[in-house]
């Protein structure tokens, strides 16, 4: 009888372990800045208009070559009220994705730990207990960060190792953190690869750096973020299908009704710039039916295309849609 009881407990324990799951989201929140001047960073566009009236600021802005960016630098009114409204919109989109929000959220384009902490405080009532952001070298100060319902045990930035022709260039590092789900260590890699206007080789080097990182250990891993590979580039270079031996990729596994995460108005087409990728053969699997982009009235226009935050109307969040998935362990 005792042996039967032990066997029964073992079976139920095994079932519970195999049914463990976490929900994750990646969200490029497009220029989530606080309203303060961050020394050493080029954040002068994201200040209140009242602080932009001095001669030094105006002269610095007039040196900006791109007209749109110059006008933002001179006239964009990024107040505390505007920032707080954007944070509230982000919170609502996150909570729309899943009851009380996903377990782990990887963010891209966050200025600093201060503004991430403000978002964390808004999300705390929904079970979030930890956050992480390490300052990288981006000249504008935009970084990657996490907010999590699991304790974050380890934090490290990994610089991209570029080929000789790109040695003079720098880009955002890969942000690795560790969490434990029960006794299982899971490694996460937050991605914000070089923008599409940079050479394809820079993104190829970024993928190589990521592959080298995950090949150094045998733990299950999740890479999620803004890979910045357009649909055209992906088709021409077979970017993601080449990875399928070792990776399961969100929009290959599910998201059947999704169009993409970013819309290019000039070309009138969608791209999956943002993805969730998980290790194959290391105990992880997607719940394919769970994979989706998060579309609400708050973060899209009438055509369900993502819209950046408008300080005048208070509508929008980002030119990216967040992507969400449940991952089984």
State where each predicted segment sits.
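N-terminal, active-site-proximal structural segment of metallo-dependent hydrolase catalytic domains
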Residues: 18-122, 135-136
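Stable alpha-helical elements in mature extracytoplasmic
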Residues: 86-90, 112-115, 143, 202-210, ...
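Structured beta-strand-rich core segments of catalytic domains in phosphoester-bond hydrolases
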Residues: 104-185
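Active-site beta-strand/loop signature of hydrolases that rely on acidic residues for catalysis
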Residues: 24-29, 73-79, 83, 97-116, ...
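Metal-dependent phosphoester-hydrolase catalytic domains
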Residues: 23, 212-222, 229-329
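Extracytoplasmic, non-cytosolic globular domains
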Residues: 105, 132-133, 163-164, 173-255
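Solvent-exposed loop/turn segments at secondary-structure junctions
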Residues: 29-33, 110-114, 136-140, 151-153, ...
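Classical Sec-dependent N-terminal signal peptides that target proteins to the secretory pathway
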Residues: 2-20
């Amino acid at each position: 009888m005792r042996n039967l009881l032990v066997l029964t407990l073992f079976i139920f324990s095994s079932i519970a372990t195999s049914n463990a799951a976490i929900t994750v989201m990646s969200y490029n929140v497009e220029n989530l800045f606080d309203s303060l001047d961050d020394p050493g960073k080029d954040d002068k566009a994201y200040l209140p208009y009242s602080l932009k009236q001095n001669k030094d600021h105006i002269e610095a802005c007039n040196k900006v070559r791109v007209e749109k960016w110059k006008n933002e630098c001179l006239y964009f009114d990024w107040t505390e009220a505007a920032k707080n409204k954007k944070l509230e919109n982000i919170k609502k989109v996150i909570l729309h994705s899943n009851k009380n929000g996903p377990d782990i959220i990887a963010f891209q384009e966050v200025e600093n730990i201060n503004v991430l902490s403000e978002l964390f405080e808004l999300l705390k009532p929904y079970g979030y207990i930890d956050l992480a952001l390490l300052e990288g070298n981006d000249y504008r100060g935009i970084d990657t960060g996490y907010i999590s319902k699991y304790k974050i045990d380890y934090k490290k930035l990994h610089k991209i190792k570029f080929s000789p022709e790109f040695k003079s260039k720098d880009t955002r590092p890969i942000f690795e953190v560790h969490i434990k789900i029960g006794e299982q260590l899971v490694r996460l890699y937050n991605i914000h690869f070089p923008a599409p206007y940079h050479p394809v080789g820079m993104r190829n080097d970024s993928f190589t750096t990521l592959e080298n990182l995950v090949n150094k250990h045998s733990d299950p891993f999740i890479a999620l973020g803004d890979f910045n590979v357009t649909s055209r580039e992906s088709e021409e270079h077979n970017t993601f299908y080449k990875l399928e031996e070792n990776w399961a990729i969100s929009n290959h596994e599910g998201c059947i009704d999704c169009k993409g995460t970013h819309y290019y108005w000039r070309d009138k087409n969608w791209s999956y710039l943002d993805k969730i990728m998980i290790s194959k053969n290391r105990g992880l699997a997607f719940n394919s039916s769970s994979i989706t982009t998060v579309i609400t009235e708050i973060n899209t226009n009438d055509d369900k295309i993502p819209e950046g935050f408008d300080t005048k109307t208070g509508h929008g969040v980002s030119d990216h849609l967040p992507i969400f998935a449940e991952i089984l362990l």
